[in-house]
Each structure stands twice: as structure tokens, then as C-alpha cells.
Amino acid sequence: MTDAGKKERVSILCVGSPSITTLLGWRLQQSSVVTCQETIMFFNAPEPSTNVFTIQSKKFGTRKYRPTYRLSKLEEVTSDSEPFDYVFVSIKPNSRNFQLSNILEPVITAKHTCIVYNSTGAIGVEEALQRQYPENPIFSLITHTPVSQRSVDEFFFGDCAPFYLAPAGSNLEIDQLSRLVEILEGGEISSEILDTLLPLEIEDLALPLSLYPLTVLTQNPNLPKLLERPDINDLHQGILQELDSLCNCLGSSLDVKKLSKQRETLLSHMQVNPAFREYRSNRPVEIVQYLHYCIDLATKQSLQVPRLRTISALISSIQHLPLVQPHHMNDMHGPTDNSPKKNKVLVNMRPINPSSFVSDRHSPLHPYSVPENGKPNMGRIPSAPSLSKGRAMTADNMDMLSLTTRRSRRSLYSPSLMQMQQSLKSDYEGLGRTFDPRFAPRGSPPVRGGKNVLSPEAKEHTHKNISPESSRFGTPSDPNSSSQSLGNEVLSRPNSNSNSAESRNGETDDSGESETYFTLMNNNKGVEPRASVASETSSMTVIPNAMRRFPLARGTSRMKS
């Protein structure tokens, strides 16, 4: 408290993952010791559309949190703005994409800003910050509070675990560290100061250091199945013993109960571990730098760690090689195995076997060579499957299918299509008798050029018992009628315009189109067009009955095909 009775004002920046950043900003704002002007920034995360966050916790219940300030990027901090007193950093380093020390440069004020790095799940990151900012105090922070983000603006916190803080390296700024602990405890966060956090960091990384590199070296991301091998399990236990010896040199030891609980959680985690995922995506494996740091610590303590050195050398030599499909990807069990398989062809394809790139000693052919008998088939369209062969349009069913629409053609099932093919498969000489015996077969030749008339037998049939159903489909009721007579001039062909019938009177005999038309309708390539006029009449009389047998349009009474 100041002399005027007012609280001290402290400017704090929290940058990192949304969950831990929101937790820190929320509790610092509620501190009863100082007036905290906190600024939060979500690093490498989607920008929320609102400035109010919903926070649920077991200790404090459901609360609304509105940060004092927000930044979308660190470059928004101007040089004339008030410097930050504390900067909480919860960012994992990524040497391939960015340097952590360079990112923090706009918000760090030399000899003033205190850097607090959240080293939960990491080790040795503070050394790079010490080299970049030698004049600023740097502290390490570890917390095991379970945090989760349910949506962009909704967070959940479990039991509030204590915060462990310690000076990084040779920093002895105990006064600023004690002041920071008071601010955190004013926000009801229990905090504790330790001499070093290295034993806790090694304990958190013991299982990842002893398991993740083995999944990369064996090309098997399935941890439970990997530990079933006796040699791999012995190697895993040997690495844990070396890490325990390193903790003993630092004045601590690994907690066996905590390790067993972590092992159960890790082995039940069905997703691929981050080290194997980074290796598969051709990115630097993060666990390698942690291995190097543990080896350096062992060297300073004059401790022999042969297994750690061997694993570190092997994984460092293969992480920059070209990627090879793993041998045991099918052994990995994960949530993706239970997801629906959209493309069965692609799902069933096995990954490329590395041995397929080497010529097979049992086969004289190259793996990618094509035999001579298969070269003529290269580039051809594969034949239709057995189910689609029955639906293909052939010369037998082209006459009827050419009169149908695409929708009705799609609704023709194979039994109906087979029935149609059987009806139309006979010679076109008896086509009229197949559907309706009332009409005569092909009759007399035309009387006049370009004019079609019916034989007396056909006229007699047309006068007898014309059903209203046939007249509904356009069957003429009067052969002498001027508008619908089969023997008159206005007799129109299927799918043609009847208004242009007179214009075709003199062109029917000589045009190539009519010859092609007669050939298609009558399947009678040897018959002249003039001699096939009666066949056209016979075909015309078949169309209404065919349509009656296979209805094409929707109606009140629709026959089920």
C-alpha cells in the first residue's frame, strides 16, 4: 500500500495458450494486494469475437471475466506506452518457425521487466532467454492445475494446484520473486518458492523422454503394444533409472506413485504422441532438445547416462532424413479407427512398403515395369461391372429408351429392362403383332410419292374397338380425319414436329436423315427408305402400347415397374 492509502498499480502481460493465459489474467485481476492492469494475448490461437469470457471452476464457480486490455499481436505495444512489470510467457519454443526470445522483444524493457516462463512440460528453455536478456530477472513457473477450453470464450479449471516458482539459473532477484508470490496469493492462488525446478521438470518429462523417442526409432506409435516387447521394456526401464540418478544428483528423486499414474494416463491416451507426429510431418522433434539438456546436466554432474546418449544420437540422425512410411501404422489404435470410412478404396490401401522401392529378387521384372501383354490395355477405360451391363443402352433397347426421359430411364430396373428387351428383340417384321394384334403387318407400298396410306386390313382394324386409353395416347379414331389419320399427309414421326410434315413431303425420299431414321426404327438396313414407309406406320402404332406398358409420366394411377 502507498502512503495515500491506495493500492500499488502493477502492469502485467500474459501471453501464451488461451487456457492458462485466461487463468492467470483472471486471478491477477482479482488480486487484493495490488491494482493489476493485466493485458492478455492468445498466441497462435483464433481471436475470440467477444471481450467477455465465461470461466467455470470448482473453487470459484461460474464467473465472467473481462480483461483490462487485450492484444492481437505483440507489435501493437508502442514504445511510449507504460512498460510491463511482469510478463508471463506460456509458449513452447519452436526453433523452426520462430525464436521465443525475438518474439518477446517488443514487450521487454531492459533492467525493468521480470520474465516469468511457464516451464510445465519443458526443460532448459530459460537459458535462451537468459542469453537474450541478461539484464532482466527470469523466473520459472510450474503448475499442474487442470485447464481446458470448451469453446472460444468458455474455459474450465479443475482443482487449483499450487504454483511453484524458482529463479532460473544464477538469478538471485528474490525480492521481485517474493512480490510476485504475494500478488498471486492475493488472487487466491497458492504459491511456493523453490531453489530450483529442475527435479520437477525432469519428473514431468520422465515418461516422455523414455517412451517417445522409442516410438520414432521403432516406427511404432502404439505405446501399449510397443512395451509388450521385452527388449523395449528393458530399455524404457533403464532410461528411467538414469533419470532418477540425475534427480538424485540434484537433491531429489522420482516419485514412483506419480510415475505410475502418469503411465496409466499416457498409455490410455489413444492419439499419436507429439514426437512421432512431428517426425512424420518432417518437423524438428521437440523431445530431442530436452534429451540434449538432460545429457548436459548429467555431464556437469559427472554422471554416466549411456542409454540417453545412444537414444539422443540415433533420433538426431534420423529426424532430418526423408520420411518413410512406418511398418506398423496398422497397429496404431485411435479414434480415427472408429470413424466412418467414406472411401473404402482409399481406406483399404496399405501404405507403401519401403522394400517395394528395391527390385524384387524373386521377380525378374522391375516393380514398376509393365508386361508386354498389358501394354495394349494401358489407358483404356475399364469395362462396366456386371450390374451396369444390364442397364447399358444397346441396339435392342435403343428404340424405346430413346423415347424416354432421363428420369424415367433412371427408374427402369433390370427386370423391366429385360422385359422390354425380350419384347423388342424379335424381328421388326412382327413388331406390330407383338404389342397389338389389331394392326396389320407391313402392308402395301405407298400409293403416291411421299404419302403414306394404310392397307384395307389396317383401316378395318382402326375402325374396330378403339379404346379411349389408346386415343388418350394419340391413337387416331378416324382414318379419314384430316388431323389424326394415319393415312393422311400430316402423319408425324415420333419426337418430331407435326407442323413441318408438309415440308417433308418432297424431301423424305432423298434426304439422308430419313434413311438413317428408317434404319434406326426398323433395324432394316437393307430396305430402301421408300419401301419402309409402311414399317414406319407399323412402328408408330406400337408406340402407344409400349408407353402403356412402360409409363413415362407421373399420373394418378402409376404402374409399378
From Swiss-Prot:
Compositional bias of kind Polar residues: 465-503
Region feature (Disordered): 369-390, 429-515
Keywords carried by this UniProt record: Phosphoprotein
Keyword Transmembrane helix attached: no
Keyword Phosphoprotein: yes
Annotated positions of the Phosphoserine modification: S383
GO annotation, cellular component aspect: cell division site; cell tip; cytoplasm
Coiled coil: none
Classification via InterPro entries: 6-PGluconate_DH-like_C_sf, 6PGD_dom2, KPA_reductase, KPR-Related, KPR_N
UniProt protein name: Uncharacterized protein C24B11.07c
Taxonomic lineage of the native organism: Eukaryota, Fungi, Dikarya, Ascomycota, Taphrinomycotina
